[in-house]
Amino acid sequence: MAISAAQNPLYIGFDLSTQQLKGLVVNSDLKVVYLSKFDFDADSRGFPIKKGVITNEAEHEVYAPVAMWLQALDTVLDGLRQQGLDFSRVKGISGAGQQHGSVYWGDRAEDLLQNLDPSKSLEAQLSDAFSHPYSPNWQDASTQKECDEFDAYLGSQEALAQATGSKAHHRFTGPQILRFQRKYPDVYRHTQRISLVSSFLASLFLGRFAPFDISDVCGMNLWNIKQGAYDEKLLKLCAGSFGVDDLKRKLGPVYEDGGLNLGSIHRYYVDRYGFNPDCTIIPATGDNPATILALPLRPSDAMVSLGTSTTFLMSTPSYQPHPATHFFNHPTTAGLYMFMLCYKNGGLAREQIRDAVNDKLGSSDDVWANFDRTALQTPPLGQKADSDPMKMGLFFPRPEIVPNLRSGQWRFDYNPADGSLHETTAGWDQPLDEARAIIESQMLSLRLRSRGLTSSPGDGKPPQPRRVYLVGGGSKNKAIAKIAGEILGGSEGVYKLEIGDNACALGAAYKAVWALERSNGQTFEDLIGQRWKEEDFIEKIADGYQPGVFEKYGQAVEGFEKMELQVLQQEKK
């Protein structure tokens, strides 16, 4: 049966995050035509959750009830139907799932998935499909012991990062599975399949187990990125006495093509909602990989998410793993990697200094006005003359992971001429000098850790991103945008990306468009780049590269690295 209105097919991207499920519908021109949401706290019935999760403080566990996600999918599909979506026009479906979370399917799962009754909801039919009713959330911190084992197993954190793209983290699926099989050996024995949240979503639409996506599998500490296969040694650690073959069966295969046709939608959705039987299911990916698909991000473009935390994402052909960073396979484009940095201290650190500045200068209607003005009036690195030392600091209201430090504040003077570094507050006009220093501190850390991943844009310019895209609350701030450009560069400038909080769902929907409309060998960046109407989504908000200033910050990066090492050594003592 051909897609009705074949000239106007529609595509759905689902985003299953910690606090809500979204279903977003786009057409071939990438225009959003429908959006349906289910907020777990506001809309779910019968689950003792707060902010989408259940917390067991005693064991540092944070997890979500999987049946709640079934309830959410039932409701989101009903919402799209009520809005008037003609499901027969939907040609493809993909999704984005919160990364690292695992779902444990029981013995009867595949049978239940295959034999869904269209007169009943998913929640009514699949609540018993799981050997374990909960999925660990990325905020879970119960696996310190297992992380230590993973970090040691190949010899060092560096070796684990080299193999899998990341050192061990509490939230990563490998350490989580290791703890799970030790804590619940009987449940693990009766687990037929382990899905990631992304492949769980795809499985629901297929009516059978969907494979992991080539990018999301990199968030497990089990996939050897360079070999393009599971790491046999790490599987051995993770499987324990149950054995590697059993774990491999539970994990299932992984395919290279992010646009793979996994098969047609299950009959259940055809009969219940009127989907076309030819509607194709495309592998769902993780929420971070989906974010870089929300625009045609070119290799060496950088995306900085300035929310409560700071996340830095980049598409790069260079694989240079380090324990402080993350590398994943790119979700659509072979030969590219997604580079990611996550910081706990983002907006909170800036707001603390903003409030101190307002206390000193008096507050106005615009709470950021004093902060912005002060930051822009302060010369780069607080240097009134080139012979003055550079002022730099670390400002962590909460413990940080990059670098691994307690909460605190440290201020230094750095002299690039002789490389000397002194911890001091002398010469600092507190808190006014800190308005610029906090932005510089956050951006210098990004520049330090993304060194070697960019190339020269030509014209004799130093290596830097082509464009820097800012998203999230901090992107509205003029001082942050200007200073970000001065430090990170951006041969074409700094842009504000306006896609609200729908980036993951958009990226998933675009992935479905690309998978089903690409010509032979056409890349995601090429197809989406041709159709993406730049003026609808982005606005240039600052210059990027500025000769002289960029190079001065290049010198500052050396001092910044020394400062971090010195503070780390002091804290060890």
UniProtKB/Swiss-Prot annotation:
Cellular component annotations (GO), alphabetically ordered: cytosol
Residues where ATP binds: 368, 473-474, 477
Gene this chain is encoded by: xkiA
Gene Ontology MF term list: ATP binding; D-xylulokinase activity
Single biological process term from Gene Ontology: xylulose metabolic process
Superkingdom, natural source: Eukaryota
Primary role: Highly specific D-xylulose kinase which participates in the catabolism of xylose. Xylose is a major component of hemicelluloses such as xylan. Most fungi utilize D-xylose via three enzymatic reactions, xylose reductase (XR), xylitol dehydrogenase (XDH), and xylulokinase, to form xylulose 5-phosphate, which enters pentose phosphate pathway.
CDD domains on file: ASKHA_NBD_FGGY_SpXK-like
Cited InterPro entries: ATPase_NBD, D-XK_euk, FGGY_C, FGGY_N
Protein's name in the database: Probable D-xylulose kinase A
Chain positions recorded as substrate binding sites: 100, 171, 287-288
EC identifiers of the protein: 2.7.1.17
Record Gene3D superfamilies: 3.30.420.40
A family per Pfam: FGGY_N
Keywords, in A-Z order: ATP-binding, Carbohydrate metabolism, Cytoplasm, Kinase, Nucleotide-binding, Transferase, Xylose metabolism
Location in the cell: Cytoplasm
Primary site of residence: cytoplasm
Induction data: By D-xylose, L-arabinose or L-arabitol.
Top-level EC class as recorded in UniProt: transferase
Similarity section: Belongs to the FGGY kinase family.
